[in-house]
């Protein structure tokens, strides 16, 4: 049987646009998917828009958010090394994966939505009947994806992600105004 190959995409953005607050990947949103894929023997590739080091949101490392599995991965030097050396989306753009997974964290809000390489990767995989999945803020990477027929991928679909209400609970409404996103008018 063919080994499944999964592309996990993480943010490369470590600061909110105001330059006052750190952000990045929400660790548990990668750790749990990574662990699940690893246990199943999948070939895992981790990429970010520009490649290189993945900033991890310091809030996701706090005790109240760091579950046992996430802590195990955070303490694993091999996993941390993978996060320091992600491939760029350009490096993986010609490959076909069985699944693309967009991890969350506020950083994704700033380098996923308008990334044309990411949009093409998602379009190509979706149109080849491959799994395209996203969690939390990672769903913003789906917003501007146009399919070959010119329609937005999210048109007439239900998408669940981090809500505006939750941004308020997290105290991030001012930092994440959503006004920087180019939301397609026909995708709502």
Role assignments for model-derived ranges:
Residues 72-93:
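Glycine-rich, highly charged phosphate/nucleotide-binding loops
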Residues 24-38:
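Short catalytic helix/loop segments, enriched in acidic residues and glycine
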Residues 50-65:
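N-terminal beta-loop-helix "entrance" segment that forms/cooperates
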Residues 6-23:
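Short glycine-rich His-centered loop
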């Amino acid at each position: 049987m063919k080994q499944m190959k999964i592309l996990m995409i993480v943010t490369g953005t470590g600061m909110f646009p105001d330059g006052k607050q750190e952000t990045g990947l929400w660790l548990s949103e990668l750790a749990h998917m990574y662990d699940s894929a690893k246990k199943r023997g999948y070939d895992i590739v981790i990429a970010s828009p520009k490649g290189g080091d993945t900033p991890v949101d310091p809030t996701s490392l706090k005790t109240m958010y760091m579950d046992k599995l996430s802590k195990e991965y955070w303490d694993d030097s091999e996993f941390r090394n993978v996060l320091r050396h992600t491939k760029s989306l350009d490096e993986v753009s010609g490959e076909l994966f069985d699944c693309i997974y967009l991890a969350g964290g506020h950083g994704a809000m700033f380098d996923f939505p308008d990334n044309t390489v990411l949009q093409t990767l998602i379009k190509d995989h979706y149109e080849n009947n491959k799994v395209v999945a996203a969690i939390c803020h990672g769903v913003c990477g789906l917003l501007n994806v146009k399919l070959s027929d010119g329609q937005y991928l999210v048109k007439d679909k239900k998408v669940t992600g981090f809500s505006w209400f939750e941004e308020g609970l997290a105290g991030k409404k001012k930092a994440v105004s959503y006004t920087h996103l180019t939301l397609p008018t026909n995708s709502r």
